[in-house]
UniProtKB/Swiss-Prot annotation:
Substrate binds at residues 73, 79, 86, 100-101, 110. It catalyses: 3-dehydroquinate = 3-dehydroshikimate + H2O. Signal peptide: none annotated. The record marks 17 as: Transition state stabilizer. It comes from Kineococcus radiotolerans (strain ATCC BAA-149 / DSM 14245 / SRS30216). Catalyzes a trans-dehydration via an enolate intermediate. Belongs to the type-II 3-dehydroquinase family. The keyword Glycoprotein does not apply. The active site is at residues 22, 99. Pfam families: DHquinase_II. InterPro entries: DHquinase_II (IPR001874), DHquinase_II_CS (IPR018509), DHquinase_II_sf (IPR036441). Pathway: Metabolic intermediate biosynthesis; chorismate biosynthesis; chorismate from D-erythrose 4-phosphate and phosphoenolpyruvate: step 3/7. This is 3-dehydroquinate dehydratase. One of its GO terms (molecular function) is 3-dehydroquinate dehydratase activity.
Amino acid sequence: MKILVLNGPNLGRLGRRQPEVYGSETLADVEARLQRLAGELGVEVELRQTDAEHEMLGWIHDAADAGLPVVLNPAAWTHTSVALRDACAELSAGLVEVHVSNVHAREDFRRHSFVSPVATGVVAGLGTAGYDLAVRFLAGRVVGGA
């Protein structure tokens, strides 16, 4: 089974953009680690990143149609996109919302998520290890049949 790991705007700059907030690990580093983890768990992961909201919506629609579980770091769209929330509501195989930083300890506007109410779970503030936790959780549901 495949788990999609989808990343929103500015995450292509992970490791370079505000390393004091997001750390020094790049998205390529995260992908390499998740590929190893997926092999251990007996699942496949596919990591994608886009700064274009319409592209993200298309990926989520495709995942919903294919019945795939999704790890999503919506980044700034977390706080702004009803369209993203509505697309995510169609995901039936599981959705874990991930944030590298603790969005609840930052500016007020970052504390609201349009995605959280339709997510299976949320991981925030654990750095890039949040991706690992999300993949482990979804793999357990897939392999365990939950």
